[in-house]
């Protein structure tokens, strides 16, 4: 989830609060009562790495199921449907239970749910039916919803307020590492072969998830005994409660309900590109020159098994190679997050959203045009330009809603259901034509997001400023 900061004073940014000398002397992880909570923060960092790793593995599963269960692209998109369905179903219950159980109770509940989903993959591998794997994906996503709902805001209160952004950015950098490692680990297990060259992916699919489940159970035990202070938080979105016009229905604000639609379409585009990345790299990439893989190339190590001869006789990337290349895409996404944070501080957020989305439209059209390696490079660049969209749409959508901001945010979070629906449309187009043509779906999605960004001043009738932190989000 994004960590937006709103300022509602006309044409001016609120002046920085004068720092209390006592607060200035406190360390980044020291509470007002003098307690040092660096160990608590250290534990939270494991949660950030965990859900980054799990999300990274999800995006390399589609191609595995296509080959093992003989599914087409539209059918394999049920993986993304199950994943986002878990987030959708638990978005509101997770917040409610977090209030009832507190930080520690909510985190432990989420960890146990993730462990249950991980252990479920053991019988699912024996059942060997698609629905069994989808159930495990959905359960894990539901548990991750708890962790994301609690861990993101909790990092902001584990010390002096002026270090809140530093703490959450530090935690999110670890999340990025998990996101990078997930596709590599997933590729190693999902696309493994025995000595005879026969795939053993289905037989070994349970191994990474069982390993995650064991680690998660250990984490739950550690959290149970670890000191975790329940710290009162200020308003999550720092919205000025004196903002006028908050008595109207939130649906009467065009900049809000169009943000819900924009978020739905953005997550749809993101999920489609992420989930079909391996398919693109193994089916749409031009023939690879033999000079890239000469006969004397080493047969072992990280690059072992990267190249294979496809049905048309051309040398291309293997599934394992494509899953490793997905990590490069996520690296572009992470770079976009860090650079985007600096850009959003210097330029108006709605303009940045508009131009980034317009760039994504142009890139998708170049992919659609099938321009060889130019199109391949464009796939990676889409990761970069998608990086700031979720938190920016989030911040623009709740701008000026005052006491209604929390209610509005729940609808924007639920809009991630777009990631469950539209990838099936993209898959259907790809099945009918090819995957390059399937990129027309994210093109249209990004087009609406660009429209929302450029039209936001008219929709919101805002005279204030919006500050966005890209420290969280999908």
Task: List the predicted regions and their residue ranges.
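Extracytoplasmic
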Residues: 39-69, 273-281
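Extracytoplasmic gate region of multi-pass secondary transporters
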Residues: 58-62, 183, 249-327
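Glycine-rich segments within core transmembrane alpha-helices of 12-TM secondary carriers
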Residues: 163-191, 410-422
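C-terminal membrane-cytosol helix-exit motif in multi-pass small-molecule transporters
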Residues: 186-195, 210-240, 450-457
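C-terminal ends and interior cores of transmembrane alpha-helices
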Residues: 112-127, 358-371, 454
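Cytosolic juxtamembrane N-terminal segment immediately preceding the first transmembrane helix
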Residues: 2-47, 51, 67, 248
């Amino acid at each position: 989830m994004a960590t937006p900061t709103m300022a509602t004073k006309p044409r001016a940014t609120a002046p920085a609060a004068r720092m209390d000398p006592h607060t200035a002397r406190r360390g980044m992880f020291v509470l007002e009562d003098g307690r040092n909570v660096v160990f608590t923060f250290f534990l939270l960092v494991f949660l950030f790495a965990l859900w980054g790793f799990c999300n990274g593995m999800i995006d390399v599963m589609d191609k595995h199921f296509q080959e093992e269960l003989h599914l087409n692209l539209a059918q394999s998109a049920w993986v993304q449907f199950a994943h986002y369905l878990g987030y959708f179903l638990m978005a509101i219950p997770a917040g409610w239970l977090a209030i009832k159980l507190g930080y520690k109770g909510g985190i432990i509940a989420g960890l146990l749910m993730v462990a249950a989903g991980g252990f479920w993959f053991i019988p699912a591998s024996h059942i060997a039916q698609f629905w069994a794997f989808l159930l495990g994906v959905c359960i894990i996503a539901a548990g991750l919803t708890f962790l994301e709902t609690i861990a993101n805001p909790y990092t902001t209160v584990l010390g002096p307020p002026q270090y809140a952004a530093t703490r959450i950015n530090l935690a999110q950098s670890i999340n990025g590492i998990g996101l990078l490692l997930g596709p590599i680990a997933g590729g190693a297990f999902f696309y493994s072969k025995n000595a005879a060259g026969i795939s053993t992916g289905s037989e070994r699919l349970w191994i990474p998830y069982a390993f995650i489940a064991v680690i998660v159970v250990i984490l739950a035990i550690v959290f149970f005994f670890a000191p975790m202070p329940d710290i009162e938080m200020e308003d999550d979105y720092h919205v000025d409660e004196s903002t006028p016009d908050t008595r109207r229905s939130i649906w009467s604000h065009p900049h809000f309900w169009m943000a819900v639609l924009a978020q739905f379409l953005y997550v749809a585009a993101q999920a489609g590109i992420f989930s079909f990345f391996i398919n693109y790299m193994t089916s749409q990439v031009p023939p690879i020159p033999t000079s890239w893989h000469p006969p004397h190339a080493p047969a072992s190590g990280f690059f072992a098994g990267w190249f294979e001869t496809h049905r048309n006789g051309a040398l291309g990337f293997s599934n394992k190679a494509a899953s490793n290349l997905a990590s490069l895409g996520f690296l572009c996404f992470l770079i976009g997050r860090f650079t985007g944070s600096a850009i959003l501080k210097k330029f108006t957020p709605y303009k940045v959203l508009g131009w980034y989305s317009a760039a994504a439209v142009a890139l998708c059209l170049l992919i659609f045009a099938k321009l060889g390696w130019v199109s391949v490079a464009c796939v990676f660049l889409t990761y970069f330009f998608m990086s700031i969209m979720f938190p920016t749409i989030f911040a623009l959508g709740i701008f000026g809603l005052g006491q209604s901001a929390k209610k509005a945010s729940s609808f924007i979070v639920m809009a991630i259901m777009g990631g469950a629906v539209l990838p099936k449309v993209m898959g259907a187009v790809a099945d009918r034509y090819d995957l390059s043509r399937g990129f027309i779906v994210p093109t249209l999605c990004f087009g609406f997001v660009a429209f929302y960004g450029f039209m936001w001043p008219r929709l919101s009738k805002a005279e204030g400023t919006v500050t966005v932190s890209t420290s969280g989000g999908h």
